[in-house]
């Protein structure tokens, strides 16, 4: 099944909260997730000239703000992080940013999706061409919610997978190789364990 770009938000078997973002693509498969610094992961084309072909293929997908991780599928990463940085509650930062940025104005009206993770709270949100939703979710050890741009743009108990990995590196590999979801390109995981640990693949 092709579900496009997606987020996976959950807890490892040993109880560590994490969020993984995977790029899946038919049109622009030559991209990487690159750790820019301790607070930022960016999605970049391997050939930088490709960034001029589509405004939505290059963006920061991870921003760390203190003890809060913001992970999304687009440029709204920075907007959400900025709103949290100036003191907005997570729910309000998500709502404001998704509502004002709106869905991507491409040929597919691609939804914007987002996850925000702290040591004791987790939120998911999305805005599509016909819906907007923000939800605080309860995480369970060994399970994770997934939220995608296509086919699975909902926040529901029916969109959960079992998770058997415990490190950010293994989680990246697990999500990249998940047989149910087609066209993997690159991924990044942010795991909370006495601070944030970040991996890419």
Swiss-Prot record:
Quote the catalytic activity from the record: IMP + H2O = 5-formamido-1-(5-phospho-D-ribosyl)imidazole-4-carboxamide
E.C. number(s) listed in UniProt: 3.5.4.10
Pathway of action? Purine metabolism; IMP biosynthesis via de novo pathway; IMP from 5-formamido-1-(5-phospho-D-ribosyl)imidazole-4-carboxamide: step 1/1
Family annotation (InterPro entries):
IMP_cyclohydrolase, IMP_cyclohydrolase-like, IMP_cyclohydrolase-like_sf
The reply on keyword Protein transport is no
Annotated GO biological processes are: 'de novo' IMP biosynthetic process
The protein's GO terms of the molecular function aspect are: IMP cyclohydrolase activity
Q: Which keywords does the record carry? A: Hydrolase, Purine biosynthesis
- Hydrolase is among the record's keywords: yes
Which Pfam families is this protein grouped with? Answer: IMP_cyclohyd
Domain of life, per lineage:
Archaea
| Family designation | Belongs to the archaeal IMP cyclohydrolase family.
Function description: Catalyzes the cyclization of 5-formylamidoimidazole-4-carboxamide ribonucleotide to IMP.
HAMAP family from the xrefs?
A: IMP_cyclohydrol (MF_00705)
- Under what name is this protein listed? IMP cyclohydrolase
Encoding gene per record:
purO
């Amino acid at each position: 099944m092709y579900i496009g770009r997606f987020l996976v938000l959950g807890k490892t078997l040993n109880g560590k909260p994490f969020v993984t973002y995977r790029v899946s693509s038919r049109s622009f498969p030559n991209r990487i997730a690159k750790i820019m610094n301790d607070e930022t992961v960016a999605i970049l084309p391997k050939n930088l000239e490709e960034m001029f072909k589509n405004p939505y293929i290059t963006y920061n997908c991870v921003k760390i703000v203190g003890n809060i991780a913001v992970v999304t599928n687009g440029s709204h990463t920075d907007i959400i992080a900025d709103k949290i940085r100036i003191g907005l509650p997570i729910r309000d930062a998500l709502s404001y940013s998704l509502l004002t940025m709106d869905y991507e104005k491409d040929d597919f009206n691609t939804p914007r999706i987002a996850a925000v993770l702290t040591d004791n709270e987790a939120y998911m949100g999305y805005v599509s061409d016909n819906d907007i939703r923000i939800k605080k979710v309860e995480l369970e050890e060994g399970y994770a919610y997934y939220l995608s741009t296509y086919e699975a743009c909902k926040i529901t108990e029916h969109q959960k997978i079992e998770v058997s990995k415990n490190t950010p590196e293994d989680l990246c590999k697990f999500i990249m190789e998940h047989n149910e979801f087609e066209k993997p390109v690159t991924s990044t995981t942010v795991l909370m364990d006495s601070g944030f640990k970040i991996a890419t693949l």
